[in-house]
Structure formats: C-alpha cells, structure tokens
Amino acid sequence: MSIVTYQRGDTTALSKNFTRDEFECQCGKCTAQMIDTELVDKLQHIRDVLGVPLKITSGYRCIVHNASKTVGGSPNSKHRYGMAADWRTLNRTVNPVALGIIAQAVGFGGIGIYWHPKAAMCHADTRTGKATWLCTTPRKYPSTTYQKFILPTIRRGCTGEANRAATKMLQRLL
C-alpha cells in the first residue's frame, strides 16, 4: 500500500484509464486528497480483464463530506484515507454482485454490494483484513459472507456478454 497526496485540480494520470480527478472528494472544498496506489492498480486490472470502462462514483472523502447526510459514511470509512472506491461499469453492463466477486478475486479486503433503487454499485477497499456486506436498502448494511451471498451467485450463471466474460474468469479463479 502506498498512499499519495494530490492537490485539487491535478490532472495526473493514475493509470492507463484512471485520472486523479475521478477519485476527488465530491464536497468541492477540499484542497488535497489521498489515493492508495494499490486501489487504482486493482481497479485498473479489473477494467483490463472486463474490457469495459469503470465509473468511480465515490473515491476519497474528507471527514466533513463522509459524515454528511447525503453520504452517511462510517466514521472509520476507508474512503477517508483514499483506500476505497465505490464503482460500477460505465453503462451498468455488469451487475454489482459480479463486480464484488471480481473484486474479491483480485484481492480487495473490503467488499460491499449496494443494490437498491438509489444505487447499484460495488464498494472495494484495500484494508488488510476481510469484510463483506450487502446493502439492499439505503443506509442499512447487514453483514454477509462470501460463502452465503457472493459464491452462490456466480454458480447460477448470468446473462450479457460482459457478465459471461466475468463469470468465466471467476470460475477459473475460484
């Protein structure tokens, strides 16, 4: 893990497909932000394997933005340290459960699936331990386990070309 601090307005390329501003705090007031290079490397690997663009819906969050009513983030959120991203495929071509499986396969420590009317995305972070959760109702986060929730989903199969490619890759890995 290597945390790098960037200034607001910096357009540095973090990888082949990600720029610094994609991970910027959405409060609009922060002058600097932190980004874990391991986070970017793993997301780039997922993007390369899937062959579809990823949309970062939330990257770094300052303390104020993380605690805001719009976000309602945990006080210990990995977003506050630049170690987490909420993301999905650009055109929502892969469901968030499949994205969670892929995130687990590339070695993310924290994986959350958000799948409710206001969101359909995956949270991934670079924590050293393991944590998984599923959120199907806004602001309610029951814990789950890889065995109970994520693993059975991949075995049922999926539809769509991008989902089929993700399934094949994961079946080789699991």
Predicted features along the sequence, with ranges:
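Generic detector of short, locally flexible boundary/turn motifs and exposed helical patches
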Residues: 19-23, 50-54, 86-91
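Extended, low-complexity, intrinsically disordered C-terminal regulatory tails
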Residues: 40-72
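N-terminal start-of-chain detector that recognizes signal peptides
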Residues: 27-29, 55-61, 94-98
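Solvent-exposed, flexible loop/coil residues
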Residues: 10, 18, 22, 64, ...
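Catalytic cores and adjacent binding grooves of peptidoglycan-active enzymes
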Residues: 75-83, 89-174
